[in-house]
C-alpha cells in the first residue's frame, strides 16, 4: 500500500482571519470559495502537488477544535524565516536554541494553532 499525504483541514469561527494569516506567511492560494453560508480555501507552499491547508467555517453551534500543529523544515534557515515573518508584520517570539543544538521558531496563528519551523 502506498500513501500520500495531501493536506490538513483547519476549522475556524473566523476563517478569513486565518486565511489572511497564512497568506501573509507566504503560502499561495490554490483554491478559494466564499459565499454567505460557506467558506473554504486551500493554501500551499507552491501548488496543489504539495500538501495543502484547507480552511473551513465552523458552523454555528459547533465547537472549535484546538490546537492543530504544523511543522516546516527550513534547511537551517530558521533566522531567515523569522526575519521574513517579522518583515510581514507578524508578531512572534525570537527563535530559540534547543537542548540538542537545533534552532526552533514557534508561531501561533490567530486561532491558536502552532506552527513550528525547524
What positions do the PLM features span?
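Acetyl-CoA-dependent GNAT
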Residues: 55-60, 94, 98
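Vicinal oxygen chelate
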Residues: 4-13, 32-33, 41-44, 60-118
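Short, charged/polar, Gly/Pro-enriched secondary-structure boundary elements
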Residues: 48-53, 111-115
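Core segments of cupin and vicinal oxygen chelate
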Residues: 2, 9-50
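Absolute protein N-terminus
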Residues: 1-2, 118
